[in-house]
Amino acid sequence: MKTIVITLFILTYVIMLTLPKYRQYAAAAVAVVMVILGVVSPLEAVNAIDWNVIMMLAGTMGTVYLCIESKMPAMVRDMLVNKLKSVKLIFVALALFSGFVSAFIDNVATVLMVAPIALAIAKKFNVSPVNTVLTVAVSSNLQGAATLVGDTTSILLAGYAGMDFMDFFVIDGKPGMFWVVQAGAVATIPILFWIFRKEKNRIETTEITKVTDFMPTYALLATVISLVIASFIPNKPALTNGLICVFFFIAVLRYEVGRDEPVATGHDAVLAIDFDTLLLLSGLFVIIQAVTNVGLIDDISNAFVNMAGDNLFKIYTILVWFSVLVSAFIDNIPYVATMLPVVSGISAQLGLDPTLLYFGLLAGATLGGNITPVGASANIAAGGILKKEGYEISAGQFMRIGVPFTLVAVVAGYVLIWLIYA
């Protein structure tokens, strides 16, 4: 059975990488096969799906759509154009802005909020939106490790290691993960300029678009503020963030439907939710559960421990780069959850403070997702946004941006974490 599961797992990712148009159907079909084979029970499959993530996606997609229809992104676009007057500078600024926002809210939510601005600018000046939307996604993934609330993997680490919000800024008198990530972000700025090197257009001052209704923007801001506040609440229900996003979407939708001149109809707002992306993620959650059930992730972890021995630098190096490699192809959440006890055990055996290995794991697992279009939920969301605009993104297209961005950011973080904590 284990061989069958591994074969199906590999087949799924091959299809997703080579036939991106059908990836959601491949993931869903293989997930169903896993249930039929008995690798995952029907109840376990339902529980394996992270409904919090699904609800966050659906709610944010709906609210962002209404915000777009209210012309708020268009207004921001025009303000950026008038301020920077260069397509290259605007696209670089959007990527950096995406990273900043993502340090405090979910990566996927960040992409859903910032990508529409990138699309609006690309459409206005008749340039391809592919590079700018993808850099928004990879920048959001980079900064997700900066704070406790930036990414699910950070939350997993903090919960396991007993860290609080401020430990990501200063821990044991040393700079925390936040500053490591900022160093990585600074290192990627030349990469961003290289990606947009051909965008040499100078832009004339443009008339600023008027927003037709500010309520969707208020709903979006309320969503962000509520997510940040919720991050400080201990022992909150698992669905809290998802319920927040869905609540504000339903609230603003109800408000718009009741207006004489709504920014969009309720029907259009619901259809704006990217159900292909939701199906893809749901299938992946079940597949990863199946792979975990047959012990594949445990086998990989044990092999890692046997290979590393007791050389700290070797352990750290293998941990970081192995995490980058694994997270390029599978969701980093189950990987990090599995590796945290392994890292803790290694540290205990060597009598070391585990902070070095904890942050090495987080850096590698978070940034590794930027290598492939299926390595992180934010990448999948970005691909879904571009697909709706008529752009099918191949693995090669994504990797031309993701690989150099990842290598520069990981090397910077890898060196700095070692210098600070070793």
Segment roles from a protein language model:
Residues 74-76, 109-120, 133-134, 146-163, ...:
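Re-entrant/interfacial helical elements at transmembrane boundaries that shape
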